[in-house]
Structure formats: C-alpha cells, structure tokens
C-alpha cells in the first residue's frame, strides 16, 4: 500500500528582516541617485539660463551699439544723397525700388534660415493694408522733407513726432505724460526753433523783390518755398503727424494680427509696392527727358546702386535694432537712440557741407539733451508702471 503524498518540506531559510531591508535600501539608493541626477541637471540648466540672462559685459555691447548707430547714419546719408539731386523728382519710384529690394532681401534671408516670419496670407494682408498705406505717406513726406532740409534740421524736427505719439497714447491707450517728459518736450521744441531760426528770420526780414519796370512785388518764387518759407518745413510737419498716426495705429493693429517685427517689415514693404508703383506711374513724369534729368548719365549707375543699397540697409537697421535691444536692454537702447541723433545730425555737416554754425551746433546739442531726458523719463515711467503692476498682483515691487 502506497504512502500518502506528503509535500517535501521547504528546507530553505525564510527571508530574514535584513534581506528585506536590503531590498528597500537598494530601491531607496536608486531613488536618491535619480533625484540627485535630476537635481544636477536642473542646477546646470538654471546656471545656463542665468548665464544667458545675465547682462553682457561692456565689451560685448560695443558691437551691437556701433552697428545700430552705423545703420542709422548710413540710411540717412544714402537717402539724402539720392534725393538731393538738382533735378530729382521721382520719389515714388525711389521708394518702390527700396521696398522691392527690401522684400527680396528678407525673403532670401528667410530661405537661408537666419530669420522667420509668416508666409503671405490674404486676411493678414487685408488687415495690414491701412498700415502700409500710412507707411508710404511717412516715407514719402520724409523724403520730400529731406530733399529741402539739411540733415541736422531734419533730424532735430523728427523729435517732434515723439510729442505727438506721447499725447496720442494718452487719448488712445490711457497713457501718461510725466513732468520730466514735459521737460524733454520743451527742449525738443526749443531745439527745433533754434534749428529753424535762420530760415524764420530770413522770411521776416526779407525785403520784397520788385519788378524794375512796374515797381510791383514779384511773387513768383522757387518751387522749394511756400509763402517764402522753405517747403521742407511743411513736408516735415506733415511727416511728424503721419509718423505719429502710423505708430499709434500700427500698435493697435499688431494686437489684432499678432505680428512680430519681421512680419511687420515684410508686409509693410510688400503691400506698399503696388501703391508706390501706381502713384509713380500716375503722378511722376516717365518721359525720356525726365528720366535723363532724374538719372543723369554721369552718375546713373551710382544712383541706382544707392537706391538698391538703401533698400537692403533697411533690413540691416531692423536686425541691428533687435540685436541692440537684445544685448543691451531697452534702457540702454533708448539712451543710445537718443544720443545717436548727434552723429546722424553731424553726418550732414561732414558729408553734405551743411553749415557748422552756432545755430546748427547748439540745436543739435539741445536736441541731444532732449533725447537723453526723454529716455530717462520713459525708463522711470516704466519702473513705476512695473511696480504698480506688481502691487496689483499682490507681489512686492
């Protein structure tokens, strides 16, 4: 008779508390090791981020600042050279060439992978069309003003646009104008009066020219004067108002479209081309005689090259501006922009023989001080606004 089945007893040692603790210790050490590695990675990422966000040294800031200043001077000088021809009247054609070159340049740079912006979209174009039209008016009136005014006077009067923009922001965006800002505005107006004083007094003190036969006053004057005053001041006033409208309405439209800097530049130039071409064909004289006067054979190649170069320079200005803001910060950039008006104004004296008299020099100096005071005022205002927002959010200023 067979024996009943009896399971073989387990003669192995049961798990001891020490072996269980060993497994727990191994899991804990793995967890701690993972946490340590993750902490090391986070610390390295934080160090790299802090390194990127740290303000570059003064030596690192020199190149972007010089690039921004050089781009501003170069653009002003080239435009002044192009429009200063004795018989140049085809401003719309000039602007069309500049815009075409600019679009070609940014498209090429985009394909090379250096920048990125939106592809063309009909809805975006429809929304941005009024802004491009305003830009055409800004550039055209600015070119006409630069045609009749010296670079120092043009640069100084351009400051008046800041006043119009500031008060436009008060009405459209609930902005505010501080006392220091008002001081800068007073200096801007004063510098403009100093710059234009010689022309103003010449109009007041000018004796009427009489016809030797009839003895009557001769009222026919050169095309460059309106009411005896340099026509450039009329164009400059129009430019200031249109420039302020362009900046204010573009700010509102950017909120709708969500455009970035390169998007704005691309659409501005692309949409302005058909407007400029139509105005050039309708208004400007395309006859052979007019073309010969506007583009004389003696410097035709140089003139056309300067037009194309100025279009490409617009891309350089946009890049150098973004580079300067990124490296130096908005405060330093605003100060550089204020002080940069001095070499831009001085370029007219150096390259175009504008008189270096007491009126011009003092106007440039007062305008430079006005720009610095305005930059300081805007910086202080930004700090106050940031502190106010921090208090509203419940944080510490």
UniProtKB/Swiss-Prot annotation:
Residues 1-61, 109-124, 169-174, 250-272, 322-332, 377-397 are cytoplasmic. The keyword Transport applies. One of its GO terms (molecular function) is GDP-mannose transmembrane transporter activity. GO terms for cellular component: cytoplasmic vesicle membrane; endoplasmic reticulum membrane; Golgi apparatus; Golgi membrane. Residues 1-57 are annotated as: Disordered. GO terms for biological process: GDP-mannose transmembrane transport. Keywords: Cytoplasmic vesicle, Endoplasmic reticulum, Glycoprotein, Golgi apparatus, Membrane, Sugar transport, Transmembrane, Transmembrane helix, Transport. InterPro entries: TPT_transporter. Residues 34-54 have a biased composition (Basic and acidic residues). The chain crosses the membrane at residues 62-82, 88-108, 125-142, 146-168, 175-197, 229-249, 273-293, 301-321, 333-353, 356-376. Glycans are attached at residue 87. Residues 83-87, 143-145, 198-228, 294-300, 354-355 are lumenal. Residues 9-19 have a biased composition (Polar residues). It is a multi-pass membrane protein. Its main location: Golgi. It is found in: Golgi apparatus membrane; Cytoplasmic vesicle membrane; Endoplasmic reticulum membrane. Homooligomer. Involved in the import of GDP-mannose from the cytoplasm into the Golgi lumen. Involved in capsule synthesis. PANTHER family: SOLUTE CARRIER FAMILY 35. NCBIfam families: nst (TIGR00803). Belongs to the TPT transporter family. SLC35D subfamily. This is GDP-mannose transporter 1. The lineage of its organism: Eukaryota, Fungi, Dikarya, Basidiomycota, Agaricomycotina. The gene is GMT1.
